[in-house]
A protein has these predicted regions:
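Basic nucleic-acid-binding interfaces
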Residues: 1-137
Length: 137
């Protein structure tokens, strides 16, 4: 496992982000998804974010990414949604016919933290902390 680091910490923070088109309008195809991914990869380094995985369905995208602890994820998501909405509508004018009042993305999003170990393993690890120390006393 390769950990990320900065001057004072070591970390590995993965997030699963799902962004949905407003009113679930079916606008994504491979070319639009590919361009949306390019926009993500262009903006992400400004927020210390690294794309790990990308996939789409007709009305939403799934993004797996890594971030630093000081990353303001909600600011990044808003910046991405704003830029991608503007650029995708400009570069793919046919999208506008499917949208409602020029709104591309739903206001809401789903953001889930992910990790390398199942939650139960982490809970047991946390519960066991200090037990060896208590046994020594």
């Amino acid at each position: 496992m390769n950990l990320d680091n900065n001057a004072h910490s070591v970390f590995l923070l993965h997030y699963h982000l799902v962004l949905v088109v407003k009113y679930r309008r079916q606008v994504f195809d491979d070319s639009i998804s590919s361009r949306a991914k390019e926009i993500f990869e262009y903006i992400a380094p400004n927020y210390n974010i690294t794309l790990e995985e990308w996939n789409h369905d007709k009305d939403h995208i799934h993004i797996l990414f890594r971030a630093h602890p000081n990353t303001e994820i909600s600011k990044f998501i808003n910046a991405y949604k704003s830029a991608s909405s503007r650029l995708l509508k400009k570069e793919f004018p046919q999208i506008r016919q499917k949208l409602w009042k020029e709104h591309f993305w739903s206001q809401s999003f789903c953001l889930i933290t992910t990790g390398g170990a199942p939650i139960e393993v982490i809970k047991k690890y946390i519960e066991s902390q200090g037990q060896r120390e208590r046994k020594r006393k």
